[in-house]
């Protein structure tokens, strides 16, 4: 059970890091050229923290699971980021993309039986 919770935590932290990156670059649109102001973005620092913590949790997952099982389960990030893209960023998602999401979920469920 702890392994599944760690895997879920790694997925959520990675997803939050990706979403924070998107918010960071969106917040840069109105900034002048150059990196000085961009590096002060709280979203950028949030992304770094989330991705760093996600890496540490991922290392704990790899201590408990075979990489051939663990890594494909990270594809849940594809599902999570797609949901955020649709409902937070209001990006259009076509039927083929939703089919891909369903297939990823099916694959994760099948792999989850090995955990």
From Swiss-Prot:
Source superkingdom: Bacteria
Molecular function, one GO term: carbohydrate derivative transmembrane transporter activity
PANTHER family the record matches: 4-AMINO-4-DEOXY-L-ARABINOSE-PHOSPHOUNDECAPRENOL FLIPPASE SUBUNIT ARNE-RELATED (PTHR30561:SF23), SMR FAMILY PROTON-DEPENDENT DRUG EFFLUX TRANSPORTER SUGE (PTHR30561)
Function: Translocates 4-amino-4-deoxy-L-arabinose-phosphoundecaprenol (alpha-L-Ara4N-phosphoundecaprenol) from the cytoplasmic to the periplasmic side of the inner membrane.
Organism name: Pseudomonas fluorescens (strain SBW25)
Entry's family note: Belongs to the ArnE family.
Designated name of the protein: Probable 4-amino-4-deoxy-L-arabinose-phosphoundecaprenol flippase subunit ArnE
Keywords: Cell inner membrane, Cell membrane, Lipid A biosynthesis, Lipid biosynthesis, Lipid metabolism, Lipopolysaccharide biosynthesis, Membrane, Transmembrane, Transmembrane helix, Transport
Transmembrane portions of the chain: 42-62, 65-85, 92-112
Subunit structure: Heterodimer of ArnE and ArnF.
Annotated pathway: Bacterial outer membrane biogenesis; lipopolysaccharide biosynthesis
Location of the EamA domain: 44-113
GO biological process: lipid A biosynthetic process; lipopolysaccharide biosynthetic process
